[in-house]
């Protein structure tokens, strides 16, 4: 009798121990899954940083082709059109590369034929303000007003109204929440950049040496599947650098495309996905 009771007690204890081990194992397994999920989420939250050390909004997931991630580079040129723009367009045409141009209103008036050519050759034409004046655009709050005026000038030349703007000096810190709300209300979009070519820094340097530095800056920064490159077609060294940049980007596997309104993805220093 006593032996039977002891046997029953031992069996119960064994069952409890097994249950405890199973519970501990499942809890541990759950912790592992939780930790993995946490690590995965942290990895997904990593964001790229621009050359001016300002982190960007997440980029659009790269498209795939034949199982490979497509690498796309967007050459963008601010402040034109100008006296070097025709030469730049010749280079782009020769290399079968597309670009995005952000125009100053006064230059739209001065070079309407270049605006037409940019559009006709498959490039995107967007707005870069009327004055390029920080105080007027941001402190006095005229960002949208100037972009709409610039938009109207472009529409007068091309017969269509683009929506993409490039903030003079970048969107941070000037494009505050109130101005961003106004951007959204007016149906405009904003693009900053992922790579700053720093082309303007070399205005006093000999053109060949300056262009070599610009090529180096761009290719060194091109490490992600999607890159948006800031340049200016009003500087001779910038235009001189373009063939080398295109060659280097193609060697890295990039395709050179123009912005497409139907495939817009947010790219601004404020992480504001509305614009």
Where are these regions (language model features)?
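Sec-dependent signal peptide cleavage junction
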Residues: 25-49
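Active-site-proximal beta-strand/loop segments in catalytic clefts of secreted hydrolases
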Residues: 77-79, 102-106, 128-130, 166-170, ...
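Low-complexity, Gly/Ser/Thr/Pro-rich intrinsically disordered linker/tail segments
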Residues: 251-275
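Catalytic grooves of carbohydrate-active enzymes
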Residues: 219-258
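Alpha-helical scaffold elements lining the catalytic groove of polysaccharide deacetylases
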Residues: 133-157, 171-225, 240-241
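Active-site beta->alpha N-cap acidic-glycine motif
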Residues: 47-138, 142-157, 248, 255, ...
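Short low-complexity, flexible loop/linker segments enriched in glycine and/or proline
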Residues: 115-117, 141-143, 205-208, 271-275
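Sec-dependent N-terminal signal peptides of Gram-positive bacterial secreted proteins and lipoproteins
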Residues: 1-33
């Amino acid at each position: 009798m006593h032996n039977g009771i002891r046997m029953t007690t031992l069996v119960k204890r064994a069952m409890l121990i097994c249950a405890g081990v199973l519970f501990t194992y499942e809890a541990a397994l759950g912790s592992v899954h939780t930790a993995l999920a946490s690590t995965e989420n942290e990895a997904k939250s990593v964001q790229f940083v621009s050359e001016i050390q300002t982190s960007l909004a997440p980029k659009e997931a790269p498209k795939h082709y034949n199982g490979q991630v497509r690498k796309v580079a967007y050459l963008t040129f601010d402040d034109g059109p100008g006296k070097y723009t025709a030469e730049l367009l010749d280079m782009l045409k020769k290399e079968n590369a597309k670009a995005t141009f952000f125009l100053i209103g006064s230059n739209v008036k001065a070079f309407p034929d270049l605006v037409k050519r940019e559009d006709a050759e498959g490039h995107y034409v967007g707005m870069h303000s009327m004055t390029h004046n920080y105080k007027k655009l941001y402190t006095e709050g005229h960002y949208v007003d100037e972009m709409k005026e610039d938009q109207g000038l472009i529409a007068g030349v091309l017969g269509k109204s683009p929506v993409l703007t490039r903030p003079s000096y970048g969107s941070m810190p000037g494009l505050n929440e109130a101005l961003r709300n106004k951007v959204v209300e007016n149906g405009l979009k904003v693009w900053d950049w992922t790579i700053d070519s720093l082309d303007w820094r070399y205005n006093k340097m000999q053109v060949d040496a300056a262009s070599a530095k610009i090529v180096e800056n761009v290719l060194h920064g091109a490490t992600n599947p999607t890159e948006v490159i800031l340049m200016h077609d009003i500087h001779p060294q910038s235009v001189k650098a373009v063939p080398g940049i295109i060659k280097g980007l193609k060697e890295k596997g990039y395709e050179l495309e123009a912005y497409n309104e139907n495939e817009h993805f947010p790219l601004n220093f404020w992480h504001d996905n509305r614009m």
